[in-house]
Amino acid sequence: GLGSVLGKILKMGANLLGGAPKGA
């Protein structure tokens, strides 16, 4: 659904910023 699409976009954005802040 729309939530999945938004989630993918957010993940892609985080990756573009240098990866998700897992160790932050």
Swiss-Prot record:
GO terms for biological process: defense response. Transmembrane segments: none annotated. The keyword Transcription regulation does not apply. It comes from the Eukaryota. The keyword Cytoplasm does not apply. Expressed by the skin glands. GO terms for cellular component: extracellular region. It is found in: Secreted. Keywords: Amphibian defense peptide, Antimicrobial, Secreted. Belongs to the gastrin/cholecystokinin family. Antimicrobial peptide. This is Caerulein precursor fragment BM1. It comes from Xenopus boumbaensis.
